[in-house]
Curated annotation (Swiss-Prot):
It comes from Homo sapiens. InterPro entries: Growth_transcription_reg, TMF_DNA-bd, TMF_TATA-bd. This is TATA element modulatory factor. It is found in: Cytoplasm; Nucleus; Golgi apparatus membrane. The modification Phosphoserine is found at residues 72, 77, 112, 136, 199, 217, 328, 330, 333, 338, 344, 413, 542, 925, 928, 933.
Length: 1093
């Protein structure tokens, strides 16, 4: 455990804490005012454990609090709307390291006096704070400042990122960590409230107390806190919402942000202007917090890659939820008091993105607190997770972010451990280097893309929610302004009505006065008349003159008064008219304002509905994200299986690749044949289609020519018939006029004859006979004329019948023409169907062209890829060839050297054998000592040379292939030869020769393998060049296909034009036929009328 230096870590944590505190004070511009007030805190611990410092909480108590003290709900004071919660600094290093270190190791950690200065917010009297804390904590021992009213009720216990890091690096700490997590997951551990002081903390006592009572605290917490939701059911909904877990950072310290809590009754009780002012203040404070967080996070985390996403999430969460909370307080009327506390710190864990809440296992049911929190709050909990690689730097940024607590949607409740594990597994596998196969990576990337897409959607939805909430706030402000204007207009209208009443009263009084004046004037006139009458009777005198002057003066005064009154009346009437106009304008304004108010209310309702819809959509998205996380888990399991399968498949793949190469060759041949056949089939189909189109166009032209000829003949016949009809009508009219004239003349003659006859009968009876004869003659002429008339009528009727027959023939011709028209229409419809087929074929060809283009692009890409691979293979081949040549030259040189050495050794061995034989031949004698000494000296020299050669050979073998089995260090070769070691040396040399020969064979085999690879590469090169040639041929064919497509388009357009012309001609023919029919009908009607008349 040399790497785990607790003192260094604690000092680093203290430095990070001090830096974070300085950055907070710098951002929030906190001056060091009244440190004694903030130093005072409540001793909140176990009775058995004595706190080392009287003014602060012992850090051991946050782990053991629930053994002795029941948690009480927070009691809100109705005096202040915003109540800032104390920001506490938790030195968790000693409690955190107690899980890993022994008490002796823990004692080395120095004392960490960590004091946090709160932001200087609205200060209240200490007595109220004392009373509120006495009610909330049931402890009346010491006082607290005004910011300690709201307490952290339910917060989930989170494992810091360094525990995971330590677990991965050392097996001991990993085992302990797993044991603790398993114990806490088997128990029903709900959210644990963390209470921490801000004063100086004695580390030694806390470490001992925590190490002794770590297991007892957890069991007691499970029992005490499991009973809390039953007691909290009577409370309000917002007071029962669980606060998010206090996150434990990597350095072992955490800061809970400043929280502003709104009291509902005080918001409702105050006026609209004050509510607007409060909302603007809260918005400005929220904006300041967000900007400070952005500055600090940007400065503190320069290496954090995904900081932008983190900032977006935090900004969207903070701003949207704050606006929603403010708007809900300003709009809704709540009867009960409720104070919601939210710790906006996010949780940090592991190397990747991970969240480790210690919670109930997936097999055990969920705790009651989670169910009650989910049932009553109905708000979705979100947690932001930051990697622990930059945990120390991030901590300074996070500690400096006083996030506004008015966020009901960012409540982090305790979630089941399987969900946390899914997030851990997912993000850990994202951060790990990609060692798996490309298929698994593609599946992972798809899942990541879907998650990122959903996150982007969520961000967009949150931004929309933000804009809608801002618009809602603006609309509410406008609504309040309009209400104020309404009240002002009502007051003005009431004042105007009062003025109107006053002026009407004045006018009535003036009218009464005018009426009285008129009456007085009338009376005065009567009196003047009477006086004048009296004066006329009496004599003129000075008295009458005086009386008249007085009366004139009275009359003038009355007239002046009447003029003044009339002027006043005019002025009053003008004022009344103006007031009425103003009243009408005010009424119009009031109506307009009412309409605006109604519209704004409707918009508000619509925006509320939209917000509800967006919330539902968000819920759906979160559910989808959960489902995707589960899917990711399944896919990861499948990945593990697939990796095993992949290993098996790779082995199979190697065996199949040889078969695939041959199959590829066959496939290329088949593709070539298929391409040739396809091109032939396409050409044949195109030729057939072109022939069919030409035939259809010829048939159309023929049909059009026949229709034109028939139309011309019909038009000629119609013209002839019209001329004949006109001639017959003219002749008949002439004959009728002539006959009428003759009938008139005859009737005149008859009348004259009758007159004469009467005269003659009266005058002379004798002259009657010739007259009678004349009459008879006249009657005979009349009969002849009538008979001639009848003949004429018969002729006319015959002619009428002929004309009718001609008409019937014309009707039959018309029917034939209509039938031909119908046939033409049928042909046109068939042409249209053919045209549609041609269009479909054209679209199909276009689709085929696009597919061919896509194929071409793909083939070009493949060609480029193959070319790149070819170049790489060529480079590799050249390199391998050069390497093999170099190795070959080296081996050849080594072989030659070895052969030379072997030859030298053989010569030396033969020389030694000869010397040994000579020595054996010579007998040992005393006289031969000088020769012996000489030979021994010679042999010693030779042996020394041999020894040096052997040593050099040993060194060369050491450098090249290995040490020789025989070493001649410290021994004379002559002695070795004398002892019979020459044969062993020769054997060693022979074995070395065999080794060298084996190496030569191995190198030759390698050369053969390389030549085989070269041949394979050459074959692949040939294949790729063939594919490239084919692709180039296809590319050359593309312009031909394009020209064919253009021709087809032109033909299609010409066919469409012809079709339009034919349709127009058919319509013209139909109109002409209708005109002819109408003409025939009118002529027949005229003839029938004439025949009837």
């Amino acid at each position: 455990m040399s790497w785990f230096n607790a003192s260094q870590l604690s000092s680093f944590a203290k430095q990070a804490l001090s830096q974070a505190q300085k950055s907070i004070d710098r951002v929030l511009d906190i001056q060091e005012e009244e440190p004694s007030i903030w130093a005072e805190t409540i001793p909140y611990g176990e009775p058995g454990i004595s706190s080392p410092v009287s003014g602060g909480w012992d850090t051991s108590t946050w782990g053991l609090k629930s053994n002795t003290e029941p948690q009480s709900p927070p009691i809100a004071s109705p005096k202040a709307i915003t109540k800032p919660v104390r920001r506490t600094v938790v030195d968790e290093s000693e409690n955190f390291f107690s899980a890993f270190l022994s008490p002796t190791d823990v004692q080395t950690i120095q004392k960490s006096p960590v004091v946090s200065k709160p932001p200087a917010k609205s200060q209240r009297p200490e007595e109220e704070v004392k009373s509120s804390l006495h009610e909330s904590l049931h402890i009346g021992q010491s006082r607290t400042p005004e910011t300690t009213e709201s307490q952290v009720k339910d917060s989930s216990l989170c494992v810091s990122g360094e525990t995971l890091a330590a677990g991965t690096s050392s097996p001991k700490t990993e085992g302990k960590h797993e044991e603790t997590v398993n114990k806490e997951s088997d128990m029903k551990v709900p959210t644990v409230s963390l209470k921490v002081s801000e004063s100086v903390i004695d580390v030694k006592t806390t470490m001992e107390s925590i190490s002794n009572t770590s297991t007892q605290s957890l069991t007691a917490e499970t029992k005490d806190i499991a009973l809390e939701p039953k007691e909290q059911k009577h409370e309000d909904r917002q007071s029962n919402t669980p606060s998010p877990p206090v996150s434990t950072f990597s350095s072992g310290t955490s800061t809970t942000s400043d929280i502003e809590v709104l009291d509902h009754e005080s918001v409702i009780s105050e006026s609209s202007a004050s509510s607007r002012q409060e909302t603007t203040d809260s918005k400005s404070s929220l904006h300041l917090m967000q900007t400070s967080f952005q500055l600090l996070s940007a400065s503190a985390c320069p290496e954090y890659n995904r900081l932008d996403d983190f900032q977006k999430l935090t900004e969207s969460c903070c701003s949207s939820d704050a606006f929603e909370r403010i708007d809900s307080f300003s709009v809704q009327s709540l009867d009960s008091r409720s104070v919601s506390e939210i710790n906006s710190d996010d949780e940090l864990s592991g190397k990747g993105y991970a969240l480790v809440p210690i919670i109930v296992n997936s097999s055990t049911p969920k705790s009651k607190t989670v169910e009650s929190a989910e049932g009553k709050s109905e708000e979705v909990n979100e947690t932001l997770v930051i990697p622990t690689e930059e945990a120390e730097m991030e901590e300074s940024g996070r500690s400096a972010t006083p996030v506004n607590c008015e966020q009901p949607d960012i409540l982090v409740s305790s979630t089941p451990i399987n969900e946390g594990q899914t997030v851990l597994d997912k993000v850990a596998e994202q951060c790990e280097p990609a060692e798996s196969q490309p298929e698994a990576l593609s599946e992972k990337e798809d899942v990541c893309k879907t998650v990122e897409f959903l996150n982007e959607k969520l961000e967009k939805r949150e931004a929309q929610l933000l804009s809608l909430s801002k618009e809602k706030a603006l609309l509410e402000e406008a609504f309040d302004n309009l209400k104020d204007e309404m009240f002002r207009v009502k007051e003005e209208s009431s004042s105007i009505s009062s003025l109107k009443d006053e002026f009407t009263q004045r006018i009535a009084e003036a009218e009464k006065k005018v009426q009285l004046a008129c009456k007085e004037r009338d009376a005065a006139k009567k009196e003047i008349k009477n006086i004048k009458e009296e004066l006329a009777t009496r004599l003129n005198s000075s008295e009458t003159a005086d009386l008249l002057k007085e009366k004139d003066e009275q009359i003038r005064g009355l007239m002046e008064e009447g003029e003044k009154l009339s002027k006043q009346q005019l002025h009053n009437s003008n004022i009344i008219k103006k007031l009425r106009a103003k009243d009408k304008e005010n009424e119009n304004m009031v109506a307009k304002l009412n309409k605006k108010v109604k519209e704004l209310e409707e918009e508000l309702q619509h925006l509320k509905q939209v917000l509800d819809g967006k919330e539902e959509v968000e819920k759906q998205h979160r559910e989808n994200i959960k489902k995707l996380n589960s899917m990711v888990e399944r896919q990861e399991k499948d990945l593990g299986r697939l990796q095993v399968d992949m290993d098996e498949l790779e082995e199979k793949n190697r065996s199949i690749q040889a078969a695939l190469d041959s199959a590829y060759k066959e496939l290329t041949d088949l593709h070539k044949a298929n391409a040739a056949k396809d091109s032939e089939a396409q050409e044949a189909a195109l030729s057939r289609e072109m022939k069919a189109k030409e035939e259809l166009s010829a048939a159309l032209e023929k049909a059009q020519e026949e229709a034109r000829q028939q139309q011309e003949t019909l038009a000629i016949q119609v013209g002839d018939l019209r001329l004949a009809l006109q001639r017959t009508e003219q002749a008949a009219a002439r004959k009728e006029d002539y006959l009428r004239h003759e009938i008139g003349e005859l009737q005149q003659r008859l009348q004259e004859a009758e007159n004469r006859n009467q005269e003659l009968s009266q005058s002379v009876s004798s002259t009657t006979r010739p007259l009678l004869r004349q009459i008879e003659n006249l009657q005979a002429t009349l009969g002849s004329q009538t008979s001639s008339w009848e003949k004429l009528e018969k002729n006319l009727s015959d002619r009428l019948g002929e004309s009718q027959t001609l008409l019937a023939a014309a009707v039959e011709r018309e029917r034939a023409a209509t039938e031909e028209l119908l046939a033409n229409k049928i042909q046109m419809s068939s042409m249209e169907s053919q045209n549609s087929l041609l269009r479909q074929e054209n679209s199909r060809f276009q689709a085929q062209l696009e597919s061919e283009k896509n194929r071409l692009c793909k083939l070009e890409d493949e060609n480029n890829r193959y070319q790149v691979e070819l170049e790489n293979l060529k480079d590799e081949y050249v390199r391998t060839l050069e390497e093999t040549r170099k190795e070959k030259t080296l081996l050849n040189s080594q072989l030659e050297m070895e052969r030379m050495k072997v030859e030298q050794e053989r010569k030396k061995a033969i020389f030694t054998q000869e010397t040994i034989k000579e020595k054996e031949r010579k007998p040992f004698s005393v006289s031969s000592t000088p020769t012996m000494s000489r030979s021994s000296s010679i042999s010693g020299v030779d042996m020394a040379g041999l020894q040096t050669s052997f040593l050099s050979q040993d060194e060369s073998h050491d450098h090249s292939f290995g040490p020789m089995p025989i070493s001649a260090n410290g021994s004379n070769l002559y002695d070795a030869v004398r002892m019979g070691a020459g044969s062993s040396i020769i054997e060693n040399l022979q074995s070395q020769l065999k080794l060298r020969e084996g190496e030569i064979t191995h190198l030759q085999l390698e050369i053969g393998n390389l030549e085989k690879t070269r041949s394979i590469m050459a074959e692949e090169l040939v294949k790729l060049t063939n594919q490239n040639d084919e692709l180039e041929e296809k590319v050359k064919e593309i312009p031909k296909l394009r020209t064919q497509l253009r021709d087809l388009d032109q033909r299609y357009n010409t066919i469409l034009q012809m079709y339009g012309e034919k349709a127009e001609e058919a319509e013209e023919l139909r109109l002409d036929l209708e005109d002819v029919k109408n003409m025939y009908k009118t002529q027949i009607d005229e003839l029938l009328r004439q025949s009837l008349s």
